A protein has these predicted regions:
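Catalytic-site neighborhood detector that most strongly recognizes the C-terminal catalytic loop/helix
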Residues: 56, 122-126, 209-234
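Basic, Lys/Arg-rich DNA-contacting stretches centered on the C-terminal catalytic core
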Residues: 46-47, 78-79, 96, 101, ...
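Basic, Lys/Arg- and aromatic-enriched nucleic-acid-binding interface segment
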Residues: 19, 34-100, 104, 124-126, ...
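Active-site/catalytic core of tyrosine-dependent DNA strand-transfer enzymes
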Residues: 134-180
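C-terminal catalytic core of tyrosine-transesterase DNA break-rejoin enzymes
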Residues: 16, 34, 88-91, 95-102, ...
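C-terminal secondary-structure termini that scaffold catalytic or DNA-interacting sites
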Residues: 67, 71, 143, 156-158, ...
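N-terminal core-binding DNA-recognition domain of tyrosine site-specific recombinases/integrases
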Residues: 1-30, 37, 72-82, 159-165, ...
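Short, polar N-cap/turn motifs at the start of nucleic acid-interacting alpha helices
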Residues: 110-117, 181, 200-220
Length: 249
């Protein structure tokens, strides 16, 4: 397996993709063994996937991306609609923590505007969740509802729902906005870090992200939480000292 990993790295395959492939291979072998097929023993070897540092959008980058997703900047109707869809899906992901595939298959029937929530089935962990909507997200989806017909919030040109087009549109906007080192998944990370920096409980963030275990959330965001805690601690030095004892005459 270690030789295979090195081969894929030389081909330019990213570590995160290799990790997904290796997990899928391991899952197939386990299922085959469970069904009674003979699966020879194999060794994974010594190899490590290099985790990237947690990257999230800052307060300057988000407006630049939204500017590049402004549909009024293009005249062609087809591109205008496509850019509007990309803008709406960007707002959905950064305000609700959706994965790109979850956002792409969202149906109008799964949105309850009266209660301000989105009902979501997360196929990755096989559970049902509901995500409260921010005012910004609710307004975005209500406005989209006026012009989009059919079952899906982000329909494809020939029916069904959009898939890879959403990802390409977002990556193109990142490039035009000169925001580097990000993908569509970083909106989800931005959603989580903004909650944590405002004091949200890690278990609440876990459920909103749809992680099966809080350990997954802690592993992904532990460094961020620690760094923010250190910053808040150092900020105490900039505050005037408050006397703890009252002077009694």
């Amino acid at each position: 397996m270690s030789r295979w990993v090195e081969y894929e790295r030389k081909r330019g395959i990213k570590d995160i993709t290799i990790r997904l492939w290796s997990r899928q291979f391991n899952k197939i072998c386990r299922n085959a063994n469970r069904l009674g097929y003979y699966v020879p023993e194999y060794e994974w070897g010594e190899w490590n996937i290099k985790d990237k540092p947690n990257r999230y959008l800052n307060d300057e980058e988000e407006p630049r991306i939204l500017k590049e997703l402004d549909p009024s900047s293009v005249q062609d109707l087809k591109h205008n609609n496509g850019r509007q869809a990309a803008r709406d899906i960007f707002i959905l992901m950064i305000n609700a923590g959706f994965r790109i595939n979850e956002a792409s298959v969202l149906k109008w029937s799964e949105i309850n505007f009266d209660n301000g929530v989105i009902y979501l089935y997360r196929s990755k962990v096989s559970n049902d969740d509901f995500i409260p909507m921010t005012k910004r997200l609710c307004a975005t989806l209500l406005n989209r509802r006026k012009s989009v017909e059919g079952e899906y919030v982000f329909p494809g040109r020939f029916g069904g729902y959009k898939t890879i087009q959403n990802n390409r549109a977002l990556e193109s906007a990142f490039s035009r906005a000169e925001v580097t080192g990000v993908s569509s998944h970083n909106q989800r990370k931005t959603f989580a870090t903004r909650l944590l920096i405002r004091g949200a409980a890690i278990t609440d963030v876990q459920h909103l992200l749809g992680h099966a275990s809080v350990k997954t959330t802690e592993k992904a965001y532990a460094a961020f939480v620690k760094n923010e805690r250190f910053k808040q601690t150092i900020d105490l030095l900039d505050k005037p000292v408050q006397p703890k004892l009252k002077v009694v005459n």
